Swiss-Prot record:
Site (Cleavage): A90, G91
Annotated GO biological process: DNA repair; DNA replication; negative regulation of DNA-templated transcription; proteolysis; SOS response
Name of protein: LexA repressor
Gene3D superfamilies for this protein: Umud Fragment, subunit A, Winged helix-like DNA-binding domain superfamily/Winged helix DNA-binding domain
EC number: 3.4.21.88
Organism: Pseudomonas paraeruginosa (strain DSM 24068 / PA7)
TM regions (residue ranges): none
Swiss-Prot/TrEMBL keywords: Autocatalytic cleavage, DNA damage, DNA repair, DNA replication, DNA-binding, Hydrolase, Repressor, SOS response, Transcription, Transcription regulation
Single annotated GO MF: serine-type endopeptidase activity
Amino acid sequence: MQKLTPRQSEILSFIKRCLEDHGFPPTRAEIAQELGFKSPNAAEEHLKALARKGAIEMTPGASRGIRIPGFEPHAANDDEGLPVIGRVAAGAPILAEQNIEESCRINPAFFNPRADYLLRVRGMSMKDIGILDGDLLAVHVTREARNGQVVVARLGEEVTVKRFKREGSKVWLLAENPEFAPIEVDLKEQELIIEGLSVGVIRR
C-alpha cells in the first residue's frame, strides 16, 4: 500500500472505528461531518484516493460500499465463547448490546473460517439445507460474498439469511424453500449490506 497523507490516515482510522463500533462503514456524509468537510463530495474524492493507494475497496452505487482489505472487525475471544444474537433491532448494528441474548460456550475456532457470533434463525426459508427455525447460525463477519454462499444480509431495516447471487448491479437473495420467493435487489436503488457468511449451524 502506498503511503497515506495525514488526512487520508484520519479517514481510514474513522472507517475502522465505525466498523469496530457499528459493524458497517460510514457514509460519505458521515465522513464529511466527522472530518469537517463542506460536502460529501469532498469525502468521495479522498475515498477515491484511498482506493487508488490500495487502502480501501469501494463498491459502486452503495452509500456504505467501503471495505478495508484484510480488516475483520468484532473478532470473538476464544475464552468468552460466542454472543448469541436474537431479534435485531431496526437500524442497530448486529452486535449492538440490545441484540445479544446470551453467550454460548463454544470455541470460535471450531468453525472455518472462525465464527464471530451466533444468530438465532427465525422462520423456515432455509429449511431445505438444514437451517431451521430456532437454530443458531454460526456467522463469520465479512463484507464480501461470492455467488452461492449463504449470507446474513441487511436490507433496509431487515436482517435475513439467504443464498447470495449477484449479476452486475443486481443481487438475488435466494431462499432454500420453494414457498419463499427470491428477493431481488438493484444496488443502484437500494443499499444491501453483507453482515457475514454462514459457517455452521448449532441445533439445541
